[in-house]
């Protein structure tokens, strides 16, 4: 697997290491002790292609750099493709061995089928468990382990082994839900968040700094929606009992580094800083990309 790591253009001065030179020195220093890591400089001098042995390998490096004071943006993980002698695209294939409680067998088979997995074998295991064996592209497993643990309520076990390279099996839709995107720069307020929380799950609370193009939550539907979470209520001379009621917000979902890396889509980046994790669109300007612009009352 590989991820693109690049300098964050919206730099935070309080962090110690924010330039592309700092990132380059740190990544190439890691090569001295990690023989399974590969670092490639991209044509864009701000970006580096970092390849490793899997999601965990790369996430450990990201967390270590974060704790050391580095600030950077990370793309969604991608697999390394090959081509055969005829120029046909090949992708890595793995065998997934899964032990799952009987009542969760259906949802696991459904989810892996959506990720181009092929069920090879199915049998009965001990203690009310079912043993499943899937052949699945490596990219189909990207971001799935956290979803698997949620679907099986922490009772499932999954192990994988590399099989080889096979012809490309088609596109995979990693997420069914779209993103909630801020289109105003400022500070989130309760009034704006109260209107936005009806559209899906929020990742931020009131009093947090946001900017245009920042992902502030997950939409309940498939498309991306732009919202203004910085808007305040217009004051009037008319008061009513309903207007004076306190607005109650659902507690936001705070993503860990692993959850954020799993969540981001191919058109998004994860901003990693020592103190915060922020998800953003690669193209911040909504005028150059098609989003649903929604103005809530």
Where on the chain are the PLM-derived regions?
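Single conserved hydrophobic/aromatic residue that forms the stacking wall/gate
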Residues: 1-9, 13, 293-296
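Short glycine-/aliphatic-rich beta-strand segments at the starts of folded cytosolic domains
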Residues: 10, 14-16, 90-100
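Flexible, glycine/charged-enriched surface loops at secondary-structure junctions
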Residues: 34-42, 120-122, 155-160, 271-273
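A common structural junction motif
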Residues: 31-35, 65-72, 113-120, 149-157
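Long insertion/accessory domains within large nucleic-acid-processing enzymes
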Residues: 136, 147-266, 271-294
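Short amphipathic alpha-helix segments
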Residues: 19-30, 100-115
